[in-house]
Design a protein with these regions (language model features):
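Mature catalytic domains of secreted/periplasmic carbohydrate-active enzymes
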Residues: 1-259
């Protein structure tokens, strides 16, 4: 904190407000770090965009990551989940020592969930399986060719084209497209993590807020068919999906043109 121009612990303020509002705090953590010289050599991203050559020192880097994770899991109260990303930067045979890292997390906070956006079959110690820009069992974006496991599922998607904020990116998905994606995720037993990149001043883009309101209006009317449901007994079809809650079955017809 002292080394930053802001001079305040942003995560502490966020954590305090989440706990106050009854929102479970989840942390995104990148295994990939272009800014550290000890990050292992051999990574495939960031070439030509300011990534330092570095010398690579895995022992040092692994200690650095675990020290950061320890700080996150001991300084900010209950943490709902650690959402990992970046494993895909290294060759598939690279040993990230994930089992030991996951054990550290579960030791510090036994109730903290662990997920990893590595685009692979889940590893031991992971509590849910995620799919990037695809629904479970689909691979339209070319990032989710792994098989669907028996773990709880999640799909992550962007509201426009980018994960972070980019002022030129106005290619926002329509409210209808977002609602359909949400419904399809529920029909495939998956949680939906919808990404929004905040503006430099911390505010959410007006278009993103408008989209959230539109989805919220739909959920106000039909939320019982999504919240607390599982995929229904009718398997997903091109025309739509089904969800169920208890002895109630909900049919979501999304495309009447399908025969």
């Amino acid at each position: 904190v002292d080394a930053t121009p802001f001079k305040r612990d942003v995560l502490k303020e966020l954590a305090d407000e989440c706990h106050k509002q009854g929102i479970k705090l989840h942390f995104y953590y990148s295994h990939l770090d272009w800014r550290r010289d000890d990050y292992p050599e051999g990574g495939g991203t960031g070439r030509g965009t300011g990534r330092p050559k570095g010398h690579g020192d895995w022992k040092s880097y692994y200690k650095f990551m675990n020290n950061q994770l320890t700080e996150l899991l001991t300084n900010y109260g209950p943490v709902g989940a650690i959402w990992f990303d970046g494993v895909w930067d290294q060759p598939k045979d690279f040993d990230w020592q994930l089992e030991e890292q996951y054990a550290l997390i579960h030791k510090l906070q036994p109730a903290c969930l662990v997920g990893n956006n590595h685009h692979r079959t889940p590893y031991a110690g992971e509590d849910f399986q995620m799919f990037e820009r695809d629904l479970p069992g689909e691979n339209k974006a070319g990032l989710s060719g792994q098989s669907v496991s028996s773990l709880p599922l999640e799909t992550c998607e962007t509201m426009n084209g980018m994960w972070g904020y980019k002022i030129e990116d106005q290619n926002y998905k329509s409210p209808k497209a977002l609602i359909h994606y949400l419904v399809k995720a529920a029909g495939k037993n998956a949680n939906l993590l919808m990404n929004i990149g905040p503006q430099p001043n911390g505010e959410l883009p007006a278009t993103a807020v408008d989209r959230l309101k539109k989805v919220g209006e739909w959920m106000d009317q039909y939320g019982e068919t999504i919240y607390g449901t599982r995929g229904g007994d009718v398997a997903p079809h091109p025309w739509g999906v089904s969800t169920r809650k208890g002895d109630r079955l909900f049919i979501h017809v999304l495309d009447l043109k399908d025969n």
